[in-house]
Amino acid sequence: MPCHNQQLNNNSESPEHAAKHVRFAQSSAAAAETCQNDAEQPEYQTTSEIHQQIGPQLKLLPLNDQIRELQTIIRDKTTSRGDFVFCADRLIRLVVEEGLNQLPYSECTVTTPTGHKYEGVKFEKGNCGVSIMRSGEAMEQGLRDCCRSIRIGKILIQSDEETQKAKVYYAKFPPDISRRKVLLMYPILSTGNTVIEAVRVLTEHGLQAKHIILLSLFSTPHGARSIVQEFPDITILTTEVHAVAPTHFGQRYFGTD
């Protein structure tokens, strides 16, 4: 458990580091020009452009080679299911750890086994998780591995066959959820419609959007932008913003592909 409440600072990053934060199909200027000439390739956008469009509500895990490799394995169509689940669980754990770092802490003093006083911090009470079924359930174990006693609610949202709009079929939350900080778990943000409906249900239960931290692994610019436009006070934490989201995640993780 971290002993500090570190905030991600995406505005002060160097151009070189920023270029590694958000990656699209092509990363060089020449490749970006190629993308514009090829309608099948996603358009290149820089980190600063994404943050101007979406705002500070979007927080990215600092990119390193470990995260980049996990992203690559998850996206690779030749990856076995065993390796897929293993790498997905590792990436989920990293996202959950940083999500916990966004929750409020309070200072405390403890006594060490040698009798010395130590000034530290501890979580403030009143946190819970909510998974959007089914793919969001893949993130539950990662949260429980970090917070053994945390309460987790569930919500099931599917597209209506006639209207194609997101429809809530099941929702169960802790009775006092309106007073809690919520880690909302949904690994892939594609259109953002499912998350928007889930947040709408949570706000109908009295929860303020500013108390919701959305944990995801991958997001499209459109998905993140749509969510922030609908709920400007929400926080979105993800590892990558890319024009193409690995929408096969749920099927691969649960072995139904």
UniProtKB/Swiss-Prot annotation:
Record key words, sorted: Cytoplasm, GTP-binding, Nucleotide-binding, Nucleus
Name of the protein in its database record: Uracil phosphoribosyltransferase homolog
Gene Ontology CC: cytoplasm; nucleus
Protein family membership: Belongs to the UPRTase family.
Gene3D superfamilies: 3.40.50.2020
Gene that encodes it: uprt
Highest taxon above the source species: Eukaryota
Positions bound to 5-phospho-alpha-D-ribose 1-diphosphate: 134, 186-194
Residues given in the record as uracil binding sites: 247-249
Native source organism of the sequence: Danio rerio (Zebrafish)
Entry GO MF terms: GTP binding
Chain sites annotated for binding GTP: 81, 90, 124-127, 151, 180
Subcellular location: Cytoplasm; Nucleus
